[in-house]
Amino acid sequence: GYNLQEHTQWAKFTNYNTSTQVPLIIYNPLSKVRGSTDALVSLIDLYPTIIDLCDLKEPEKQLDGISLKPILKNPQLEGKSYVFIKKENGFTLKTKDFSYTEFIKPKDNSIITRMLFDHRTDKAENFNVAGHSDYENIISELNFILHSNFQENIEGK
């Protein structure tokens, strides 16, 4: 995860998978379920998961994450349909199949450029397909999700 010259980058300061994906291991000594999952989750889900596993009361309307307890009980569950990642002026929406990033100009919130990677064919994120007409509908859909769910993050509120 340190971008050892992948994408000509060094260290963790990009929106590429090499910077944003981390291994996640959860051990629950009370559970008999063992295994791994490909479920899409986010690190903001850890605190709600710990609260849920310990049967503590969740703070009302304060947590953005969701408990991973259902996935821990059944690793075949899908997890989230997307996760949001922000790194400086890059705003990324990741799904199972795609990684969509918009780089936004802070002064007027205009889009500087976009990146779209199709993880079904390019897990290493080497080929930006944002300019390919075959992906126009995907870009529209991901752009809509990004701006309708995370506009306050984009505008810096």
Regions found by a protein language model. Name each.
Residues 21, 42, 46, 51, ...:
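Long, internal low-complexity/basic segments
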Residues 6, 26, 70, 93-95, ...:
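Conserved hydrophobic "DFG−1" position in protein kinase catalytic cores
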Residues 23-24, 46, 68, 100, ...:
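Generic structural signal for small/hydrophobic residues in well-ordered secondary structure
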Residues 3, 15, 24, 36, ...:
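Conserved beta-strand positions that form and line the central face of beta-propeller blades
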Residues 1-32, 42:
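Histidine-centered active-site microenvironments of extracellular/periplasmic hydrolases
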